[in-house]
């Protein structure tokens, strides 16, 4: 399918949530992406947000293939060895006491907002009124109502006002 045919096909079938760049990628290697014409691009976005894994690093593909043969995804309502092992590594590397796993960056932002509010509530009590969250201007944190509430870019926020008071 040509680039123009692919663009038209996508516009017909996919909800327009972002302005897309007129490039169609075919594959990646390391930190590079290649379009359908073979042009090489340095992937400054490193994939996308929470999935900044690069492309085909030694050992990475093999580890994914091995895990896919066992479990591709399982809810955190159940125990599984890879999650426990990853949690242990994160705790040791971060110095924190627990790891928190989510399925997306938006869930991570929502979890962080809730953790900050719960911390303030537990430490200072409801009456202290410590519920405000500091956010950066010109930021983007996701499309959920909580994430939009701390997004500092007005054109993302405006269509969904009034947001959650942060």
Language model region names:
Residues 159-160:
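A glycine-rich helix N-cap at a beta->alpha junction
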Residues 113-114, 143-149:
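Short acidic, glycine/serine/threonine-rich loops at helix termini
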Residues 164-166:
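Conserved small/polar residues in nucleotide/adenosyl-binding loops
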Residues 40-126:
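Glycine-rich loop-to-alpha-helix module at the N-terminal edge of alpha/beta enzyme cores
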Residues 23-43:
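Active-site and channel-lining beta-strand-loop segments
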Residues 106-107, 140-145:
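Conserved A3 ("GATE") glycine/threonine-rich loop of ANL adenylate-forming enzymes
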Residues 119-141, 149:
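Conserved PLP-anchoring active-site segment centered on the Schiff-base-forming lysine
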Residues 1-29:
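Active-site-adjacent loop/helix segments that line or gate small-molecule/cofactor pockets in enzymes
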